[in-house]
Each structure stands twice: as structure tokens, then as C-alpha cells.
């Protein structure tokens, strides 16, 4: 019997080749309970062998609070410890401002579109 994919509250997961594409479905990541759910769900994905390459698409998200940004940074750091790579795409202008303030692009590759991010996985690994 094949194992069914996990059901998530905040994420939609799709494999594109060997890349786990994670669409964050929430419009806002404002509250601590959302950050906790995001941490749990992204943690489940990023710890898997099949998610050695993970693309987090924030295109639907209009607002990210500081706690959720901390979660995203933690996911990148944990993935690196596992030898995995995380990239981001689709940041709206408001989310991009916050990402720039916390220095997300110093820890992970941030691309405008999913296609650009997927193409970047085929190139050399991101070096900090």
C-alpha cells in the first residue's frame, strides 16, 4: 500500500522533478499560531530525503509577521544542517521588504518566479 501525502493546513505540496515545491496558501502569516503551524508543516517537509531541494513559494502571502520570518530562517538553517537546499520565490513587494530587512537573501536564494527558482536548482548551489 502506498503512503498518501500528508495533509497540511497552510501548505500545498507538489513535486517538480526532484524539487519539492511548497506553496504557502495563507494570505497572511500574522499570528503566533500560524507561525507554529508553518514551523510544524515546513519542518515535516524539509526533513524528508525527497525534499533535499525545496522551493518555498510565497506568492499568495501578502503579510509575514516577525515570528513567521523567524520560522522561515529556521527552516533554511535546519535544511542546511541536513545538507538540503531551500530557495524562495514569489515574494510580494510588502513581503520582500520584510525579507530584505531580515536578510533572507543572505541565507537562501530568492527568485522572482517559480520557473527562475527551478532553473537555479539546476545550476551551482547557493553559497553564502
For each feature predicted by the language model, list its residue ranges.
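STAS-typified acidic loop motif
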Residues: 3-40
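Residues that form or immediately flank small-molecule/cofactor binding pockets and catalytic motifs
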Residues: 18, 93, 115
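Short regulatory "switch" loops immediately downstream of catalytic or recognition motifs
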Residues: 22-26, 45, 122-123
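Amphipathic alpha-helical interaction surfaces in cytosolic regulatory modules
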Residues: 28-108
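Short acidic-hydrophobic, aromatic-tinged amphipathic segments that line or gate anion-handling sites
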Residues: 108-117
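Short, charged, intrinsically disordered terminal tails
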Residues: 116-128
Amino acid at each position: 500500500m502506498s503512503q498518501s501525502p500528508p495533509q497540511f493546513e497552510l501548505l500545498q505540496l507538489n513535486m517538480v522533478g526532484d524539487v519539492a515545491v511548497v506553496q504557502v496558501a495563507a494570505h497572511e502569516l500574522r499570528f503566533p499560531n500560524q507561525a507554529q503551524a508553518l514551523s510544524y508543516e515546513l519542518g515535516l517537509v524539509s526533513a524528508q530525503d525527497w525534499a533535499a531541494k525545496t522551493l518555498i513559494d510565497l506568492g499568495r502571502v501578502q503579510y509575514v509577521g516577525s515570528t513567521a520570518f523567524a520560522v522561515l530562517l529556521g527552516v533554511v538553517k535546519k535544511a542546511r544542517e541536513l545538507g538540503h537546499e531551500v530557495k524562495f520565490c514569489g515574494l510580494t513587494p510588502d513581503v520582500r521588504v520584510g525579507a530584505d530587512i531580515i536578510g533572507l537573501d543572505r541565507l537562501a536564494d530568492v527568485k522572482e518566479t517559480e520557473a527562475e527558482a527551478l532553473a537555479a536548482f539546476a545550476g551551482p548551489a547557493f553559497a553564502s
